Amino acid sequence: MTVADRIGVMDRGELIQVATAPEIYEQPNSRWVADFIGEVNLIEGTIAEVGAGEVAIESPAAGCLRAAAPAELAPGATVWLVLRPEKLRIGYAPPAGPHENCAAGKVAHIGYRGDFSIYKLQLDSGLVMKAAVANTTRATEHPIGVGDRVWLTWAPEAGVVLTR
């Protein structure tokens, strides 16, 4: 994505989004663009509440979530919360603060990629999510292993809410 100042993403001959590389990666305008440009977690849900710059999303797969979102969303609308794996944190304890999103599950797989590892977690609902964790210590010192029960946490502004 460092080849040009602006990138055009096409799907079956239709131009879907034109923007800078950071804009396309951080603010995709559709699920298709989000998935095409990199690893992504998609959580489907319904808008339960709209506040000042934030929405509450009710999801059968992940419970009630908070996310930063534009004001034009209305309660009852079907949406998808897009979360990049590197925006998630993984640990043994639920978040300390009330404003963090969280989901519990088990580590199903760990993919070591050198500078980081991808953790695949199966949530209690059955949804599989990925979290990318920087390998800042030696591989033998990682405390979280396959089969461990853990929590995924993320801030409301970590994701992007999409309607298509």
Model-inferred region functions:
Residues 1-63, 86:
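Internal alpha/beta loop-helix hairpins
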Residues 40-42, 50-164:
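Non-catalytic connector elements of ABC transporters
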